[in-house]
Amino acid sequence: MPRSSRSPGDPGALLEDVAHNPRPRRIAQRGRNTSRMAEDTSPNMNDNILLPVRNNDQALGLTQCMLGCVSWFTCFACSLRTQAQQVLFNTCRCKLLCQKLMEKTGILLLCAFGFWMFSIHLPSKMKVWQDDSINGPLQSLRLYQEKVRHHSGEIQDLRGSMNQLIAKLQEMEAMSDEQKMAQKIMKMIHGDYIEKPDFALKSIGASIDFEHTSVTYNHEKAHSYWNWIQLWNYAQPPDVILEPNVTPGNCWAFEGDRGQVTIQLAQKVYLSNLTLQHIPKTISLSGSLDTAPKDFVIYGMEGSPKEEVFLGAFQFQPENIIQMFPLQNQPARAFSAVKVKISSNWGNPGFTCLYRVRVHGSVAPPREQPHQNPYPKRD
């Protein structure tokens, strides 16, 4: 609505403003109610006490207008205060927001600057570190790889050698029992397992005393027994037992199961042991060992006429083809001859075979002599 052209001090203008403003209107209504109450109470008071009353309507209206203006100004000030507070509050929030935004922006800029500086100086430092810290270990690693390659070649060579040895062992395991036995027999035939000097060896001067030795068995049966081709009368002399050649048929045979042989030693010897050797059953032409000697007695002989000294009685087991017998009686004297007297064999009534006889002892007298156990002389 357009404003009226009334002056500010006009009471009508004030009333009009009061009509448009609700709060001054309420104040004016209160003023009217107060005037009415005064009018209502005035008759009662006039009834009791009659005083002179002066009505001033113009002053009352002016007061009401002033009160309405004050109320209006108060409301306007309150609204201005509220709006000012809101504006100030919003301004503070904006300031805080701007401050935080600036702080975060500064931090981001600082981080970006630091990263830029780090990226500029890092490559050179990384290069130096690689030169100092990586090249050394890399060189060591290359040397280690070369050593590993070298040792790998050696390992391959060793593995090849091991494979060859394994193949040979497998071949040896695949050999039959007969081959193993034959090899063992050949070793026993050609090898000397008695590591003692043999004073009955023909090659060093030992011989046979034929005067005190049994007659050699000479018969057609022996010829057919040992040789299939009958070209000559087959018989080996007694001194064959003084040679190391122990092969089937290369033995001295005497008739029956009783006989003797006297061996003249190469020199006088303090006797300690005697060894008998026979062929194994596996290579015997007859397939048996019935011609091997069984029970026998050993005598030491010295002087002329020769005196016999009993040295021991023994039994030969043909399963053990080489047997060494320690003498039961070892007198403290040296002997120049040894007699081996056989009293039985292992079942052959026709003849007995001796393959090899060895005599062991020492040239010097032994330090300690065992207790002598002399036996009566035997023919």
From Swiss-Prot:
Residues 1-105 are nuclear. It is a single-pass membrane protein. Keywords: Coiled coil, Differentiation, Disease variant, Glycoprotein, Golgi apparatus, Membrane, Nucleus, Spermatogenesis, Transmembrane, Transmembrane helix. Pfam families: Sad1_UNC. The chain crosses the membrane at residues 106-122. Residues 141-182 form a coiled coil. Changing T275M: In SPGF16; significant reduction in protein expression; impaired localization to nuclear inner membrane; in mouse model decreases interaction with DNAJB13. GO terms for biological process: spermatid development; spermatogenesis. Disulfide bonds: none annotated. GO terms for cellular component: Golgi apparatus; meiotic nuclear membrane microtubule tethering complex; nuclear envelope; nuclear inner membrane; sperm head-tail coupling apparatus. Plays an essential role in anchoring sperm head to the tail. Is responsible for the attachment of the coupling apparatus to the sperm nuclear envelope. Probable homotrimer. Interacts with DNAJB13. It is linked to Spermatogenic failure 16: An infertility disorder caused by spermatogenesis defects and characterized by abnormally shaped spermatozoa in the semen of affected individuals. Most spermatozoa are made up of headless tails, while a small proportion has an abnormal head-tail junction. A few spermatozoa are made up of tailless heads. This is SUN domain-containing protein 5. It comes from Homo sapiens (Human).
